[in-house]
Amino acid sequence: MPPSLSHLFLLSTFASLALCSFYCKNPGYPCLNGGTCLYNGECNCTSGFRGFNCGLDSSTISAACTVECHNKGICFNGDKCYCTKDYMGPTCQQAYDFADCNKSSMKIKAYRPTEFNGEIFLMQSMFGCKLTEVTSTIPGYKQYELDVPHDSTGPCKLKKTIDATTGDVHFEVNVSTIHHAGQFGMYDGLKTVSCHYSSRDQAIVKDVTNHELLVSVTTSDGNTQNIQEIQTNDVIHLTFNPVNLPGGYKGVKILDLEMYSVQWNEVNSILLLKDQCMTQKADELGYSVSNEVDGYSGRAILKAIPLFENVQASVYFNYRLRFCRNRCKIKSCPSQSPKPMPMGEIFKHQGQGIRIV
Ligand SMILES: *[C@@H]1O[C@H](CO)[C@@H](O)[C@H](O)[C@H]1NC(C)=O
Ligand SMILES: *[C@@H]1O[C@H](CO)[C@@H](O)[C@H](O)[C@H]1NC(C)=O
Ligand SMILES: *[C@@H]1O[C@H](CO)[C@@H](O)[C@H](O)[C@H]1NC(C)=O
């Protein structure tokens, strides 16, 4: 019985700054605590205060902190975050400009101070691709949105790139802000927002909007018997078989392979293969893994040792595959050097668990 796989992409979204986003001459961007606004739009803070808008009292900066401030926010008073100019929220997790991504579209969103009275639009068209104001989900801010389908061919279309090696898909667009409707000034902003679709777990991504590639994963002993339970030192053959490989792709190889177990809501994880090579960690743990190329299917052979101490739960595999135009080449791996373990990763789907008894 092949394990069932979900077909979600891992999504991430980024916003990077291309032009200034804080300019104290713009309405809604004051210098605080007696700071003065300089000709160049930066604040000159009075002594004892710092930060882009002088909003941080230096004497309150905390070395020890009970909250985690994201995006280079600085902790003060032990549990508060002072955010950099592109982020807001209690722990600075909320960007002012960002994109919500799903499988079919990119929703570009922006928050602005209530005093903001300008316009936000995609750089390619000030008139045709304007973000419209919607009811704000954050009190004290205005909210703007524009939903652009991935396959849009109109003036608002997104820039799409596909990584030929990994199959990762990337959509990107530039968002302009003008603070005084109708005039673009040097103190207006430009940001790049993007959606990145990782092909991890997902095999090759030819087209995000039209993609249904299944990979069946089987765990077997050397005699092709499917196994559900193994003993220490048993050999496990893990086979990845794409069900509907697009034309032109003939080989499959395991790029990354991670073994994990969830017990009492804790994830124990070991990276077995990283960029096709066995990790130092794998070696330290005393088991072997090899990455075989077998034409149409990718195979890993593992030797089961007590993988996670004190863990009775089933073991699952998380993986990333590479699809090759022909038979995949065998990579010569460098001599092993220590590599960090993956941290706190959330697994999007699970292969069939094997119980190690
Ligand atoms: C900033 O303010 C201080 C006084 O608080 C002043 O001496 C200094 O010249 C100011 N800097 C600029 C660049 O205006
Ligand atoms: C997600 O997709 C639907 C169409 O299926 C679209 O209407 C919606 O706006 C999208 N949401 C986001 C956040 O992109
Ligand atoms: C966004 O703007 C930057 C800076 O002008 C430029 O390098 C980049 O190519 C632009 N990206 C898109 C998708 O237009």
From Swiss-Prot:
GO terms for molecular function: signaling receptor binding. One of its GO terms (cellular component) is cell surface. Prismatic layer of shell (at protein level). Expressed primarily in the mantle with highest level in the mantle edge and lower level in the mantle pallium. InterPro entries: Dev_Signal_Modulators, EGF-like_dom. Residues 1-20 form the signal peptide. Residues 21-55, 61-93 form the EGF-like domain. The keyword Secreted applies. Disulfide bonds join 24-37, 31-43, 45-54, 65-75, 69-81, 83-92. Keywords: Disulfide bond, EGF-like domain, Repeat, Secreted, Signal. SMART domains: EGF. It is found in: Secreted. This is EGF-like domain-containing protein 2. It comes from Pinctada maxima (Silver-lipped pearl oyster).
